[in-house]
C-alpha cells in the first residue's frame, strides 16, 4: 500500500480519491408560503414615515399597495378560462418558471416536477395601501417616496446556532425590456431581520389589524 492510501480505495488498480458534494448538508428555511406573510409595520428606517411619532398615523401616509401570491396551476392547464391566451401566459409577470432555468446543472429524479414553485410580488407605487389615511391627491404626487412591505415569523430565531449565514433568492426582472426605465426610476428591495414590530398602524394599541379577535 502507498503511504496515506487506505485499503479499498482503488479503482482500476489506482488509488482514487472521492470528493463528497455534501448533498443534504445544508438546512434551509423556505419562505415562499404566501399564507405565512402578512402586512408589515412601518420600518424603523429607510422609508418615509420612519421618523414619525409612535402615536401619529402619518407614519403610514406613504404606504403603497403590495400584493403577494402564487399563480394557480389551473391557468396553465386545459381548464384555464377561455379569455386567457397563450400570449398572456408568456409574459414574464405571469409565466411559469422551470427548475433548469434557475439551476441548469441540477438533475431531476423521475417523477419530480420540472416547475419551480415561486412567490410572486406585485407592487403598485401609485395606489394607496391598507391603513393609509393620506389624502389621495398628495399620495400620488410622490410615487418615488412610497413604500410597501410584508412580514412573517421565522421558526428559527438563533441564526448562529442554526448556522444560518445568508439569504438566497432568485429574482426575475420583468422590466429588462422596458427602455423607458432608468436607474433613478427603479426601486429598492430591503430585507430586515430581527425583532420586528407587528403594530401596523403604529399607534401603540392592539387594534387587531390582522383581523377581528376570535372571541
PLM region spans:
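Surface-exposed, low-hydrophobicity segments enriched in Gly/Pro/acidic/Ser residues
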Residues: 1-215
Amino acid at each position: 500500500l502507498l503511504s496515506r492510501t487506505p485499503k479499498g480505495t482503488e479503482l482500476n488498480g489506482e488509488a482514487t480519491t472521492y470528493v463528497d458534494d455534501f448533498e443534504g448538508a445544508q438546512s434551509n428555511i423556505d419562505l415562499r408560503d404566501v399564507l405565512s406573510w402578512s402586512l408589515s409595520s412601518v420600518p424603523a428606517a429607510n422609508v418615509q414615515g420612519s421618523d414619525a411619532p409612535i402615536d401619529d398615523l402619518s407614519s403610514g401616509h406613504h404606504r403603497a399597495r403590495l400584493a403577494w401570491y402564487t399563480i394557480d396551476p389551473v391557468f396553465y392547464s386545459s381548464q384555464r378560462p377561455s379569455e386567457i391566451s397563450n400570449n398572456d401566459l408568456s409574459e414574464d409577470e405571469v409565466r411559469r418558471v422551470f427548475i433548469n432555468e434557475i439551476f441548469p446543472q441540477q438533475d431531476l429524479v423521475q417523477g419530480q416536477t420540472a416547475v419551480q414553485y415561486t412567490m410572486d410580488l406585485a407592487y403598485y407605487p401609485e395606489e394607496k395601501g391598507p391603513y393609509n389615511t393620506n389624502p389621495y391627491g398628495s399620495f400620488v404626487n410622490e410615487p418615488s417616496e412610497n413604500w410597501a412591505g410584508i412580514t412573517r415569523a421565522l421558526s428559527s430565531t438563533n441564526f448562529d446556532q442554526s448556522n444560518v449565514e445568508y439569504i438566497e433568492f432568485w429574482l426575475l426582472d420583468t422590466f429588462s425590456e422596458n427602455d423607458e426605465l432608468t436607474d433613478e426610476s427603479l426601486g429598492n428591495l430591503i430585507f430586515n431581520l430581527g425583532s420586528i414590530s407587528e403594530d401596523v398602524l403604529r399607534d401603540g394599541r392592539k387594534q387587531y389589524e390582522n383581523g377581528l379577535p376570535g372571541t
